[in-house]
UniProtKB/Swiss-Prot annotation:
Belongs to the 'phage' integrase family. XerC subfamily. PROSITE patterns: CB (PS51900), TYR_RECOMBINASE (PS51898). Forms a cyclic heterotetrameric complex composed of two molecules of XerC and two molecules of XerD. This is Tyrosine recombinase XerC. The gene is xerC. It comes from the Bacteria. One of its GO terms (cellular component) is cytoplasm. GO terms for molecular function: DNA binding; tyrosine-based site-specific recombinase activity. Its main location: cytoplasm.
Length: 316
């Protein structure tokens, strides 16, 4: 944003600012550092409003506030810096409401731009194949490969995977019932190597699981496996299989999404498969049924195409 100019602010802008600074000092008891931060933010915004022809704070509406935020974005300000300025402005407007200068806070409905979170690097298909070439007969190794095949084969969140019960898995139809964010239930297709290795795990699971334990994946103690255990075992397998990238559950989920999208170019289906919340809005305009999702999955997923030749498992 522009720096303060030498042109004095009109009294309609200047006087309320000075009153607010005194309020911060005398009544709020804020530190000098915090007071300076408020003043720096507000002076810059006041100068910009003045340059746009405003002479008093009651002239400011949500549109002007959005212009301030937009100007910051265009000038390359960080999202966190814009959020700080909007926060200062909201506090100032609340003060003006207390003083009867404003009747409503025009910055209340204006959101700062979201901070861009860098996506985790995904594995390429060769790295995934290298990771998943686990052919040990130990029940825990079979379990771990089933977990990784399912995580990559269905794009599940870690919490979704850990919460799966045996009754949620249907091998013959290639469906898993999962509970996603917001306690929302969805059916997820899985196939090929994921079906094969979950089936292998189910054959040896009874040797580890307590008879009353409903969880699909259990620890060596026979109870539902923990999030931390899954993370730890995946990282260990990444090292054991000499995969260069650090292996995490979310990296497998992200790789699933990337590889499906690269193969199908069907962003809408990928969003459905991942269970993203914003799908509920787009479903008003277009609805993809489960069979369509399963078809996209079967055609696009690199390991779904590796069908086991004579897989005849019953539903578990």
């Amino acid at each position: 944003m522009t720096t303060a100019s030498n042109t004095p602010l009109p009294s309609g802008l200047r006087k309320p600012l000075d009153q607010f600074y005194e309020y911060l000092r005398a009544e709020k008891g804020l530190s000098l550092h915090t007071q300076r931060n408020y003043k720096q933010q507000l002076e810059t915004m006041a100068e910009h409003l003045h340059s746009m022809g405003l002479k008093a704070w009651p002239q400011v509406d949500a549109g002007w506030v959005r212009q301030l935020a937009g100007k910051g974005m265009r000038e390359g300000m960080k999202a966190s810096s814009i959020a700080t300025r909007l926060s200062s402005l909201r506090s100032f407007f609340d003060f003006l409401i207390l003083r009867g200068i404003l009747t409503a806070n025009p910055a209340k409905g204006v959101s700062a731009p979201r901070k861009k979170r860098p996506l985790p690097k995904n594995l390429d298909v060769d790295e995934v194949n290298q990771l998943l070439e686990v052919n040990e007969d130990d029940p825990l190794a079979i379990r771990d490969r089933a977990i990784m095949e399912l995580m990559y084969g269905a794009g599940l969140r870690l919490a979704e995977l850990v919460d799966i019960d045996v009754r949620d898995v249907h091998l013959r139809s290639g469906e898993i019932r999962v509970i996603g964010k917001g306690n929302k239930e969805r059916k997820v297709p899985f196939a090929g190597m994921a079906v094969e290795w979950v089936g292998k795990w189910l054959k040896v699971r009874s040797g580890l699981a307590d008879p009353s334990e409903p969880a699909l994946f259990v620890s060596k103690l026979g109870t539902r496996i923990s999030h931390r255990s899954v993370q730890k075992r995946m990282a260990e397998w990444g090292q054991k299989q000499a995969v260069a990238s650090h292996i995490t559950p979310h990296k497998l989920r992200h790789s699933f999404a990337t590889h499906i999208l690269e193969s199908s170019n069907n962003l809408r289906a990928v969003q459905e498969l991942l269970g993203h919340e914003n799908i509920s809005t787009t479903q008003i305009y277009t609805h993809l049924d489960f069979q369509h999702l399963a078809d996209v999955y079967d055609q696009a997923h690199p390991r779904a195409r590796k069908k086991s030749s004579q897989h005849k498992e019953e539903d578990e």
